[in-house]
Amino acid sequence: MDVTRLLLATLLVFLCFFTAYSHPPPEEKLRDDRSLRSNSSVNLLDFPSVSIVALNKKSKQTSRKEAEKKRSSKKEASMKKVARPRTPLSAPCVATRDSCKPPAPACCDPCASCQCRFFRSACSCRVLSLNC
């Protein structure tokens, strides 16, 4: 009986010390900015100051105009690029990424080969090696 009480007492003391040392100490309250600057680990003067500026109506309108100019120039550039019509291939072959399900002819590109998926239900000519 005395041994169990001794073990329980030491366990209680251990738990008291453990709970006391596991909690962090209360932080000191800083009274002014000077003590804050001296105690801080990061120097606040190292970072550049940030200024927030509100846009007025004129600057908003100019930015809209610039955006419209960019959009119109992109549209003009896309209109200038006219898609060239593909010339029909004279040889009996299958173009790259077209269906080549057997008994279709071979692929036109010498680096391409007919690759089938889903139990040979979907076949297409694909270029497998880039170094060809």
UniProtKB/Swiss-Prot annotation:
PROSITE patterns: AGOUTI_1, AGOUTI_2. Its main location: secreted. Transmembrane segments: none annotated. The keyword Ion transport does not apply. Keywords: Disulfide bond, Glycoprotein, Knottin, Secreted, Signal. Pfam families: Agouti (PF05039). Glycans are attached at residue 39. Residues 57-88 are annotated as: Disordered. Residues 63-79 have a biased composition (Basic and acidic residues). It comes from the Eukaryota. GO terms for biological process: hormone-mediated signaling pathway; melanin biosynthetic process; melanosome organization. Residues 93-132 form the Agouti domain. Residues 1-22 form the signal peptide. The presence of a 'disulfide through disulfide knot' structurally defines this protein as a knottin. This is Agouti-signaling protein. The lineage of its organism: Eukaryota, Metazoa, Chordata, Craniata, Vertebrata. The gene is ASIP.
